[in-house]
Amino acid sequence: MRLAEVDGKALLRRHGLAVPRGVLLRAGEGPSDEAAGWPGFFLKAQLLEGGRGKRGLVRRLENLGEFRDARRLILAALDDADTPLLLEEAVPIAREIFVAVRIDGTRQRLELLLAPEGGDNVEQSAKLARIPIEVAAPATPATPGKIFPVIAKFFPRELAARLARYAARLPDIARQEDLQLLEINPLALTRDGDFVACDAKVIRDDSADFRHDPEDFSISRMLAERAMTALERAARD
């Protein structure tokens, strides 16, 4: 099951990784007082597919006075007034990085991917580090030291060391959560020097559902249910 962004970020937060502050808005709901002090905003449609930016479903707001128009444009593009929206803090970004862990099915192992730039078509870039990770090998204090020399050619030395420590945590998260893919794109290096996961693509193995709380990822489950055809629903039931 692919997770909606809001659920994917909740998973990251549960494992101690920083994500932007955000508020989930359902049909008819507006911004809360909590958002008033944020320095800027993004309004994002919560879907189970990619390509939202190209479809006009992610909008940058300079202030909350732009919220109504942004919501109207997003919902009109979807032709669906019930789509949940994520209102999120705009993080001050100094640099964007790509980091992911996925199952390499051909070799029956995990693969850690890192690139010095985020954005589209990262996996076609020559500047992409690919690091094999044994499925049954949990991270140890030595793991960042194995990642560092592979990525050091792409980043300043101090940043490479910090990023190696950050990336070393992802395979363990993937194992614990039964993930087929955990992609953070972009991972923002903020102007204050912090790492913040600004977007997350997360796919979990459906066959592992029995190991997890059925209440987890409620938005993703609702969206998946809405997307099912009558035949798919009948086959499931």
Say what each PLM segment does.
Residues 1-184, 188-237:
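ATP-dependent carboxylate/acyl-activation modules
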